[in-house]
Amino acid sequence: MKFERHLLLTLREELSKPTPVIHVLIGPRQVGKTTIALQIQESVKIPTIYATADSPVPLDSSWIETHWKRAVTESHASKSPVILILDELQKVKGWSETLKMLWDSRLGGPEIRVLILGSASLLMQEGLTESLAGRFFLHRCSHWS
């Protein structure tokens, strides 16, 4: 039997319907953020793309753009919305500006639902408040209890 946290149920429900915001899952390292994301990926009925920026080489905005294009292509092919999950996004240089540009350009295009994960809360929150104000909903993942 798999353990499912309440946060998983909340996020799965939110991402299974049209959403006007980017969902952001933040919390300390090793609390289960990636596990929740992978459980969402295997349990929703719409296509999901998962990518992690946890890389030994620095990544830039083209990494985000590549995965966004994958989501758009998948949405056209499947004729359905797509969930794009980007893990450890704070490691990508210029991530918030790039995501803002892509998010704002989606109107009239395929429905891309976005979940971003990050463990460096300060870096995530700075990017969220600077570029993505009004475009996100913050979910906090605490230690297992």
Identify the function of each model-found stretch.
Residues 1-145:
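Phosphate-binding site recognition
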